[in-house]
Design a protein with these regions (language model features):
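Positively charged n-region of N-terminal signal peptides that target proteins for export
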Residues: 1-6
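Short, flexible, surface-exposed loop segments at domain boundaries
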Residues: 19-82, 87-420
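Bacterial N-terminal signal peptides
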Residues: 8-18
């Protein structure tokens, strides 16, 4: 990914989200099926990733509320079809996120409660007082538009962490820090005490260091406290059990831009390889039916991908298109997605100059096939593979056999177990 492309992507997301948290309405918002929801309607919360079902793009988060964090039960979430995951300030998949990572969330009510892949909660669930746990820990807005880790959140919003003081004992201890705007701010930022230990990774340029390395260099004390004088860094934040009711842990410290950009590049390459093997997700806007199975399909590619993936969609390029669930799991095909996918070619690629909502790439692709399949209908989700992308065999859990191709059977049933 080119540096300019990265800055453009981060800036674009930042502009589209500017002030969204502040102006979000109190009333819960339910997206309309087939439409990209306005970001300013999203409910904002934060918590620790506890469970992941990557094949179905869902999981659970322990939401940070007003009370004792460690007692909060994990809450289910599902990514919207066009929902974006970002890790280390780059596009990602749920499988890329380590358990325990503290994530920032933008979510809505389920678009259609009848087909939700996670439990549907009362719309006012986040307002319920849970005693010692406090309020805000059970949001009904569990269908997510954006899920991002700490450095992704800070880089998108133009923020940094400033380290004030470190206190070390036996290669572990605490850091006092505050999250602040890079441009400076008039109000004093709240300071937070975060833990760190011998496993905390410290990135300096291309180097990977540990706490003991900074101690050996005399940068941090072997024991006791030292002022860090507001050193600007980016932090990776997790949670681990300790004696405090609510205290978070530092998994990574990026000391400079070179270190952070190296992490961005690495995650971007992981993302590109993943999408090329699983195909680009898109929404069907229109289908023009011809005779004997011929059809022309207009789709909108989902947003949040690396720019280089979109450039692979070119006029007259051969392509495959397959139906998908809202979980982005391929449907049909006993032997994998390519088995029953519609084959054809790209007629045109149309890019809009207008502002588009988050989750929308602003790119339409017109695709012509001589044998359209059932899953390609207006409003449905599909996945598209241009001919230049690799032909791979997906693992069994990432596509549905025809038996499971109806909504009532999208979850595994006893059929998956052998008969003895």
């Amino acid at each position: 990914m080119k540096h300019g492309s990265l800055i453009g992507l981060v800036s674009g997301i930042a502009v589209s989200m500017l002030g969204s948290a502040a102006i979000a309405e109190d009333a819960p918002f339910r997206p309309e099926p087939g439409k990209f929801p306005p970001l300013e309607k999203a409910h904002v919360y934060r918590g620790e990733l506890v469970f992941v079902d990557h094949a179905n793009r869902r999981g659970s988060i322990r939401v940070q509320g007003e009370g004792t964090y460690f007692r909060n039960p994990p809450q289910p979430f599902a990514m919207l079809p066009y929902g974006m995951v970002r890790y280390h300030a780059a596009p990602a998949d749920l499988r890329d996120l380590p358990l325990g990572t503290v994530l920032h969330v933008r979510g809505y009510l389920p678009p259609d409660p009848k087909t939700s892949v996670v439990p549907v909660l009362p719309v006012n669930a986040k307002d319920k007082d849970h005693g010692y746990l406090g309020k805000g820990i059970t949001p009904a807005e569990n269908h997510l538009l954006l899920l991002e880790d700490e450095p992704s959140h800070c880089l998108r919003e133009g923020k940094i962490w400033k380290l004030k003081e470190v206190n070390i004992t036996n290669n572990a201890g605490t850091i006092v820090a505050s999250r602040e705007s890079k441009q400076g701010q008039t109000e004093k930022a709240d300071e937070e005490t975060l833990t760190l230990d011998g496993a905390t990774c410290i990135w300096r340029g291309r180097e990977s260091l540990l706490v003991e390395d900074l101690i050996a260099e005399g940068i941090w004390p072997n024991s006791g406290k030292k002022s860090l004088e507001g050193q600007a860094v980016q932090l990776g934040i997790t949670w681990k059990p300790n004696a405090e009711f609510t205290q978070f842990h530092i998994s990574d410290i990026w000391l400079d831009d070179t270190a952070m950009q190296f992490a961005v590049r690495k995650q971007t390459e992981t993302h590109k390889a993943f999408i090329r093997s699983r195909w680009m997700p898109a929404r069907v806007d229109a289908v023009e039916y011809g005779k004997f199975g011929h059809a022309t399909v207009t789709t909108t590619l989902f947003g949040g991908m690396d720019d280089s993936l979109y450039t692979d969609f070119k006029k007259n390029v051969p392509a495959l298109m397959n139906g998908a669930e809202n979980t982005l799991k391929h449907t049909a095909g006993v032997h994998g997605p390519a088995h029953m996918a519609s084959r054809g070619s790209i007629l045109d690629v149309i890019k809009t100059d207008e502002d588009v909502p988050l989750g929308n790439s602003g790119i339409q692709v017109r695709f012509k096939t001589d044998l359209i399949i059932e899953g390609i209908r207006p409003g449905r989700v599909v996945r598209v593979r241009p001919d230049s992308w690799p032909k791979v065999k997906l693992p069994r859990e990432e596509y549905l056999e025809p038996l499971f191709g109806i909504p009532q059977k999208r979850f595994p049933t006893p059929y998956i177990f052998p008969k003895y």
